């Protein structure tokens, strides 16, 4: 595959932003989220106008996908509610997860840190742009977003508003980047040619999308199949019961 200067620039920007993001304290991260949340209300008419543009251009998609694509004031309120919940989360960074002492007296700690740069490929739902941007920023991760072409204008304005909030709060706006070129070559490049920039890829969509991502990705993939039904077995759990559950 030929060198892609557009995607290379996005990758480099994300890597630089992720290094800066490590040093942004919780209070400042939350201030960005609060400002973005206010923008969702202030610019709601512009968001709905962009979404209506997507709806008008939508061709050949089924009713369920069209329903996921369509935004209204209630859905924007739900997006704002999600952001408020994320703001309430305790700081996920710098937490001591476990601690133990070695026989030689050395104390070892397992401490939570950001993953780095996350690539997200998703379909239909514009609210994913809002939710994922907020979650990644809260957890100290830069994110590269590639939404479905059917939601292009909706995703673009939502990512632009988050970048506006970042810039207003003197944070690197490239903590959040949206691939605003529709060519599928950019997706292939993201999956196969950017392991030096991207730490993990997360696909969110149907089985065919997950299958393609897993087949082409040259970086770790956090994917799902028919349902997101994970089981975490704590060290204190009853293992016999856990085996039955799994």
Role assignments for model-derived ranges:
Residues 188-200, 206-215, 237, 244:
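Active-site/ligand-binding-proximal alpha/beta "capping" segment
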Residues 100-109, 122-134, 189:
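Short, charged beta->alpha transition segments
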Residues 13, 124-142, 161-168, 210-246:
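ALDH superfamily catalytic-core signature
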Residues 72, 85, 103-110, 177-195:
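A structured beta-alpha segment of the ubiquitous adenosine-cofactor-binding alpha/beta core
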Residues 95, 145, 177-180, 202-205, ...:
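General beta-strand structural signal in soluble alpha/beta enzymes
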Residues 113-116, 123-181:
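A glycine-rich phosphate/pyrophosphate-binding beta-strand-loop-alpha-helix module
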Residues 1-110:
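N-terminal Rossmann-like NAD(P)+-binding subdomain of aldehyde/semialdehyde dehydrogenases
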């Amino acid at each position: 595959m030929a060198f892609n200067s557009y995607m290379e620039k996005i990758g480099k920007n994300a890597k630089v932003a992720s290094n800066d993001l490590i040093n942004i304290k919780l209070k400042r991260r939350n201030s960005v989220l609060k400002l973005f949340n206010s923008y969702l209300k202030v610019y709601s008419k512009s968001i709905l106008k962009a979404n209506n543009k997507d709806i008008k251009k939508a061709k050949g998609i089924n009713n369920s996908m069209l329903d996921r694509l369509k935004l209204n004031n209630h859905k924007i309120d739900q997006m704002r509610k999600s952001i408020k919940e994320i703001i309430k989360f305790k700081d996920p960074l710098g937490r001591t997860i476990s601690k133990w002492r070695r026989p030689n007296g050395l104390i070892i700690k397992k401490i939570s840190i950001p993953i780095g740069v996350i690539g997200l490929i998703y379909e239909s739902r514009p609210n994913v742009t809002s939710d994922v941007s907020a979650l990644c920023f809260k957890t100290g991760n830069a994110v590269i977003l590639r939404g479905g072409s059917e939601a292009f204008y909706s995703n673009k304005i939502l990512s632009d508003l988050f970048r506006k909030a970042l810039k207003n709060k003197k944070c690197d706006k490239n903590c959040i980047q949206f691939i605003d070129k529709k060519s599928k070559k950019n997706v292939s490049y993201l999956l196969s040619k950017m392991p030096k920039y991207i730490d993990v890829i997360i696909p969110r969509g149907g089985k065919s999308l997950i299958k393609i991502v897993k087949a082409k990705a040259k970086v770790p993939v956090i994917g799902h199949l028919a349902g997101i039904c994970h089981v975490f077995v704590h060290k204190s759990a009853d293992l016999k019961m856990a085996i039955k559950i799994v």
